[in-house]
Structure formats: C-alpha cells, structure tokens
Regions:
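Bacterial N-terminal signal peptides
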Residues: 6-13
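N-terminal signal peptide c-region/cleavage motif recognized by signal peptidases
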Residues: 13-16, 21
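Outer membrane beta-barrel
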Residues: 20-34, 46-170, 202-206
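Residue-level detector of the transmembrane beta-barrel scaffold of outer-membrane proteins
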Residues: 23-25, 72-74, 109-113, 162-164, ...
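Transmembrane beta-barrel strands of outer-membrane/channel proteins
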Residues: 28-34, 75-79, 114, 165-169, ...
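Gram-negative outer-membrane beta-barrel proteins
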Residues: 32-40, 81-87, 118-122, 171-175, ...
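Detector for outer-membrane/organellar transmembrane beta-barrel domains
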Residues: 192-310, 323
Length: 325
C-alpha cells in the first residue's frame, strides 16, 4: 500500500522568565494533513494531527539553584499535550515528556526521574526530520518515545566528546497501550523485570559528528508488545554521523533492533539518509529517506519525506511537509 501525506502548520515557541533561577517554556504546533490511499477503498481523508506536525507541543518548567564551586541543583517538569483536543500525550501523564531532579557540574549532569534514554541523544543531530509527523517514528514508534520512568542518568561532555548512561528500575508505569504507555512498572521482586539501560558515546565538532548508542528494555508480566517476561529483551543499536558543509548538513544513520518478542523476524534494520539546507536566514529545507527491512522476512517499508520551514520571527514559523510511504 502506498500513501501520500502532507501537512501545513504553524508552530509558536513561548519562553518566559519567572526569575533568575526559574523559566517557563513551551511550544504549540498545530497541523492539518491530507492522507491518500486509506483503507481498502483507497480513499483520502483530512484530519488534524494530534501528536505532532513538526515538533511535539509542550509546556515546561525549569529551575536551578547555584550551590557554589560550579555545582547547581536543577529540576525539570515538562508536559506534552495535543493542541487539537487539549489532551495530555505520553500515555496521559501530567508531565510525561520529562520529570526529574538532579545536579549539574563541570563533570556532567546526574539526575533521577522520568528522562530521555541515550538513544534519543544519539540520533538528535543525525536524524534530520526528527519528530516530524513523517519521519523515523513512522517506522519505529519507540524512537521519538525513548524515555524511561524511574531512571537514573548521567551525561557529560568533554572537548566535544559526550558520554552518557541511563538505568531504569521500572521503565514504564502507564498502561495506555501506546509506545508511551506499555504497562511495565517493574520495581518488583524480579531484579530484571521492566528494567531499561542505555549507553552513549558521541562526538560533535563544527564540521562533523558521530554517535554510538545501545538501548535495551526488558519485559514483565502484563507488558504490551508481547514483552511479557523479564527474560525477553528489546535491544536497539544506533550508529550515525553527519557532516556540515557551508549551509548544508548531510547525515546517515542506522538503528538495528533485536526484539525477542518477535518470533518471526526478531532483527530489523532502519536506515536513514537526510539533508538539511539553510537556503536563507529564514528558510530551511530538509529531506530524508528511510528504509526498514526485517531479516528473514519479506516485510519492507520505504519512506520519503521533505519539509520547508519559514521563520516569521525567532519564535514563530510556518512549515509544510510531504511524505510518501
């Protein structure tokens, strides 16, 4: 089945200050899309996107306190919402995008709470379209939802080299039946149940960058996606890189997945190749191609997507995006 998809939207980011140590920030992104070749009839439909057009809508609160000697205490709570209906996203959580407290120092950051895993940080600069409605998340829904509840994280950057790790005692306490709610709270007597861990090695410079990350989640009784036992694992290996030439960025990456819960085709490779071109200070054009293939199976998927973004100001932009799968 082939589909053509398009969306036109307006995104508004609204940072504001509560004081020297506290900030309220946010972004509202509303998109209307037209989808062709839907269902057995092959008809089309028009709808308003609920999760994202180009960037997911959110409102967040960030506070910090200087403790001296380069050490600061930080707290972040960030809520995701669907502006078309005014409902919470991330499985209905009140602060589902991020919710953590920690410390920041010259040696890096250490935090506890609901946070991004290292898979998210590994692809942030190489996956050109990112959380766009037509992007890597269309083929692997975990990628834009790479977060873990009950997580302990460390991340530090030293002369362009970033290292990081996460460990979650119970990766997902919500039973929404979506990638953001897979009913695996963990923290029981089984030491492996619903655990998550990830590790990151990343280098960035003005001319180029590369990243390597591993992300592994374990199952538990009642967990969704057939990960119903702590003996079952879902692992992803992310390798990518990018180069910058004048106003152009080119990027290539791979996410290899080994999913114990899939008896038919446990291994899959998701390749992506993208380009971002800053045509003018106010106009950016980006495009990306994706190829998902399963080992030992004829199942394949190819996605092509492009986007043009025009900035009306530092905080407001219009964009149009097109996808074909």
């Amino acid at each position: 089945m082939k589909r053509r998809l398009a969306a036109l939207s307006c995104a508004v980011a609204s940072p504001g200050a509560l004081g020297q140590s506290a900030v309220v920030y946010g972004l509202v992104d509303v998109a209307v899309e037209h989808v062709t070749h839907v269902g057995a009839s092959g008809g089309g439909l028009n709808r308003m996107a609920s999760a994202t057009g180009s960037l997911p809508s959110r409102i967040g609160f960030r506070a910090s306190e200087d403790l001296g000697d380069g050490l600061s205490a930080v707290v972040v709570i960030e809520q995701g919402f669907a502006p078309n209906a005014g409902t919470f996203t991330q499985g209905g959580r009140a602060f589902g995008r991020q919710s953590y407290v920690g410390f920041v120092a010259p040696w890096g950051s250490l935090a506890v709470g609901r946070q991004y895993t290292m898979l998210y940080w590994s692809i942030l600069d190489a996956d050109i379209l990112g959380t766009n409605i037509y992007g890597s998340g269309s083929l692997d829904a975990y990628i834009p939802n790479a977060r873990a509840d009950n997580a302990i994280t460390y991340r530090g950057t030293f002369s362009g080299l970033t290292v990081g790790a996460t460990f979650s005692l119970g990766r997902d306490s919500v039973s929404a039946g979506s990638p953001a709610g897979t009913n695996c709270p963990g923290e029981g007597s089984d030491a492996r149940e619903c655990r998550e861990w990830s590790a990151l090695l990343k280098y960035d410079s003005p001319a180029w960058g590369a990243a390597l990350a591993v992300d592994q989640i374990r199952g538990g009784p009642g967990a969704f996606a057939n990960l119903t036992s702590s003996a079952l694992q879902d692992r992803r290996l992310s390798v990518n890189g990018y180069v910058n030439v004048a106003n152009l960025r080119l990027a290539l990456g791979l996410v290899r997945r080994d999913n114990d819960a899939s008896a038919v085709a446990p291994r899959s490779d998701l390749w992506y190749l993208g380009a971002l071109y800053a045509a003018t200070p106010t106009l950016k054009i980006d495009a990306e191609a994706f190829r998902l293939a399963f080992k030992g199976s004829a199942n394949r998927a190819t996605l092509f997507a492009g986007r043009a973004t025009y900035s009306l100001s530092k905080r407001t932009a219009l964009y149009a995006t097109l996808g074909h799968i």
